[in-house]
Regions:
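RecA-like P-loop NTPase motor core of helicase/translocase proteins
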Residues: 1-174
Length: 174
């Protein structure tokens, strides 16, 4: 929805940032399509990526860790005191993102709690991480709460939700 300039979310972001917004997917980033130090400096750059984008189990997933001449111009702007990902080329997309210290929004963050997911997130060197989840962990720093009726009114709940109260944990699933 963020790449659709007619979508209300995108229109709001465009309004808030004076139309200086670019939304990128993984392929656009790898190709350096309108993604360079000047554009990143002059606009809000939103990178829409999934955890799968950084999984290195297949050829496509490894591309974010490989040398990439399309992104070589970013290396001139790296902070020599910055945090670098060991054994990853300085022109690799993941290294470029790491050097930007991005603000990261993790949707459905309760699905991203494995050691590998946390390590991958740390490799991106975020300045801030905002976790979005319907099931926060105990002692989470909850910024806002939206009840299910409000979500239903906003058509945010796509499937019927049926909740049963069980008298004891041993009765779950029965």
């Amino acid at each position: 929805c963020l790449q659709d300039v007619n979508h209300p979310y995108r229109q709001r972001i465009d309004t808030d940032f004076g139309g200086r917004v670019e939304v990128y997917n993984k392929q656009q980033l790898l190709n350096g399509q309108n993604f360079n130090p000047t554009s990143v400096n002059e606009q809000l750059s939103i990178l829409v990526l999934s955890y799968d984008s950084f999984r290195s189990t297949d050829k496509e997933g490894r591309k974010v860790y490989q040398e990439n001449s399309n992104l070589a111009q970013f290396t001139k702007f790296y902070n020599s005191n910055g945090t670098f990902i060991e054994d990853v080329d300085e022109t690799a997309l993941v290294q470029v993102i790491n050097q930007m210290s991005p603000l990261i929004v993790v949707d459905e963050s309760h699905h991203a709690q494995s050691n590998l997911s946390i390590e991958m997130l740390n490799n991106l060197n975020p300045c801030f991480v905002l976790d979005l989840t319907a099931t926060p962990k105990k002692h989470s720093n909850i910024i806002t709460y939206v009840d299910s009726l409000q979500l239903k009114k906003e058509n945010m709940v796509k499937l019927p939700v049926i909740v049963y109260n069980r008298p004891h944990v041993s009765k779950i699933g029965k």
